[in-house]
């Protein structure tokens, strides 16, 4: 059994019995969270937020517009709303919190067609929402009103891969898992991994500057992306699909589009540096009694595991209770419940070397009483099962009906204090409790290595009373600790009005100036970002 993998021998000594899995098991690490709540009927965003008005500059689609699109696209590249098809898959976000009213989805199969579409929409002032896998969590990939949806799903080809340098060039619509599988066959690995890897697109993760579970080891996409192909709002194609790791000639323009959420250009191609595939992996699931101990274990892990440390995740007790409610057939990894849990992944090139380092680390933190209990996966199946207790949290948070998700950065010492403050505020407002109370509770989990907290407020319904209790309270708290209101999910529609809590007025003005310069008609992803 898993709980017997760390076996007390004598005194405070512990016997390490973990084995490393085959490298191919990485393919199954992170499954896409595919839960789609049906307990809450999605209302139109325009109804939920009546203070947001449709921009009168934007034209409503006419038969002439449709005829033009038919002249440049095949029948398979055009989806229209009808009595039998309301385009809900494209109009609604994953959480069923935001819903637009688009009547037309275009799925071009070439960059040139993307260019023609944008050139026409810019001239006609037709608003456009770029959409990848639609796995975003801040309402950034769905329309607010009747904007045209431009899906990149048909731009899904691998263009080139250099097995010497590890540089991959691909279309923006390539699914992240497919890109990773492709380079894994050649002993490389994508430098980013997400729970939504089975649905999200490479272009989408670049456009949102997604962080994910490997940032601790491989850094952000600002460092991994070498070049981009972008179609500007006027249809101009900017091709900078470089394969050079060093290029010191002028402004690094690609950085403007990484994290820009499709507001100044649509990414259609990505050149990215992949990393050598590790040969040895291991996952440990540990318990500690306080968040202070979480920090102590992290410091020790960085010191003692060093170059083989690839993920360090923490989960609070409530998050694991929710996960357990969904993993009904799975045995909890530990015998007893604890206030906090840690999931550590190591990956390296030498099994014996990594085995020795991990064994020493675990013995040290357990002898000193920092870690109270723990298990180590012995095979691929157990490894994936341990990861499920982290991966299931987003799905479990929504299982009661809905979830308010906040993705923030905070100094490590303050990381969990936001969860405590949020629970206290919800309790004071008398919103938390058993049904009919609308709030189940607030939970915390996240990436300790980069100070990224995921605060999930599980609810039985979405309502304005809950939202007003949480916002701007959460953002004010983050600002008071000099954090960021968005660590990796982006701004989208949800956080557009709160960027001032993380950026100065001068910075916001520069961003708005860039938007006006590159998209003077404001057609790309309106009502969002800034």
Swiss-Prot record:
UniProt KW keywords: FAD, Flavoprotein, Mitochondrion, Oxidoreductase, Transit peptide
Enzyme Commission number(s) of this protein: 1.1.99.40, 1.1.2.4
Annotated catalysed reactions: (R)-lactate + 2 Fe(III)-[cytochrome c] = 2 Fe(II)-[cytochrome c] + pyruvate + 2 H(+); (R)-2-hydroxyglutarate + pyruvate = (R)-lactate + 2-oxoglutarate
Main location: mitochondrion
Localization per record: Mitochondrion matrix
FAD-binding PCMH-type domain boundaries: 98-277
Subunit architecture: Interacts with F-actin.
Miscellaneous field: Present with 11400 molecules/cell in log phase SD medium.
Function, in words: Catalyzes the reversible oxidation of (R)-2-hydroxyglutarate to 2-oxoglutarate coupled to reduction of pyruvate to (R)-lactate. Can also use oxaloacetate as electron acceptor instead of pyruvate producing (R)-malate. In addition to its enzymatic role it could play an important role in the yeast cell morphology.
Protein name (database record): D-2-hydroxyglutarate--pyruvate transhydrogenase DLD2
Gene (UniProt): DLD2
